[in-house]
């Protein structure tokens, strides 16, 4: 019975503050939409892959050893891709449109465990630029690693052409997140409003706050 009364009380409080529950989430939603569509710059990510591949041979045991050796070299090659030498060469390949430090901030290098694949990911504000930069990294890396390591076991597996996708801002996530944030703020506001509002508004408040029985009430006349 007591829990039912509490739920009824909560329902009444929410109904009395319905405007706040509607206005604040909508306000947060509108602000998020403005920031997402008009303030934040879009980011596009393009991907390309290079393969650390074994030389051709007829000896299965030798080939298996070379595959394992190439897998171990992948981590070294990942660091080479991010090295100043590669960054400088890519910057030159792009006619110095981007500085090496800027290229470094756009670049992410990953690989799947126990594979000979290196994934080159590039993020920029333009779809075509992301693809062009990713392709340049793949091209320069495949040319420079043989010179640096004195081995010829790197090739471009896939180019970035047509791979660029928009990765930021995440419109749906931003809008939904802003709406629920506004809802939480509204509920917190209502909670503190109820906690700190000590005004006596009805007979129940008189009995609860003053501990006095209500003998009668005077109707309000207009």
Swiss-Prot record:
Keywords of this entry: Capsule biogenesis/degradation, Cell membrane, Exopolysaccharide synthesis, Membrane, Transmembrane, Transmembrane helix, Virulence
Membrane topology classification: Multi-pass membrane protein
Molecular function as annotated in GO: carbohydrate:proton symporter activity; protein tyrosine kinase activity
A GO BP entry: polysaccharide biosynthetic process
GO CC annotations, alphabetized: plasma membrane
Record field: transmembrane: 20-40, 172-192
Taxonomic superkingdom: Bacteria
Keyword flag Membrane: yes
Major place of residence: membrane
Cellular localisation: Cell membrane
Keyword Transmembrane: yes
Its biological purpose: Required for the biosynthesis of type 5 capsular polysaccharide (Cap5/CP5). Might act as the chain-length regulator.
Protein family (similarity comment): Belongs to the CpsC/CapA family.
Name recorded for this polypeptide: Capsular polysaccharide type 5 biosynthesis protein cap5A
């Amino acid at each position: 019975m007591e829990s039912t009364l509490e739920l009824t009380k909560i329902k009444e409080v929410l109904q009395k503050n319905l405007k706040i529950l509607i206005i604040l989430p909508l306000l947060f939603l509108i602000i998020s939409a403005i920031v997402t569509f008009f303030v934040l710059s879009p980011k596009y990510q393009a991907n390309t892959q290079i393969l650390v591949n074994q030389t051709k041979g007829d000896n299965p045991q030798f080939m298996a050893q070379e595959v394992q050796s190439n897998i171990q070299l992948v981590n070294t090659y990942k660091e080479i891709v991010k090295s100043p030498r590669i960054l400088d060469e890519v910057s030159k390949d792009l006619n110095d449109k981007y500085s090496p430090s800027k290229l470094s901030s756009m670049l992410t290098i990953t690989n799947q465990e126990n594979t000979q694949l290196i994934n080159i990911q590039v993020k920029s504000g333009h779809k075509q630029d992301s693809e062009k930069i990713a392709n340049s990294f793949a091209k320069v890396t495949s040319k420079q690693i043989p010179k640096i390591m004195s081995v010829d076991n790197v090739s471009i597996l896939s180019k970035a052409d047509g791979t660029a996708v928009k990765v930021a801002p995440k419109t749906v996530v931003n809008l939904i997140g802003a709406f629920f944030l506004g809802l939480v703020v509204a509920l917190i506001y209502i909670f503190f409003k109820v906690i700190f509002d000590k005004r006596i508004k009805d007979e129940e408040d008189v009995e609860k706050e003053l501990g006095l029985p209500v003998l009668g009430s005077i109707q309000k006349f207009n």
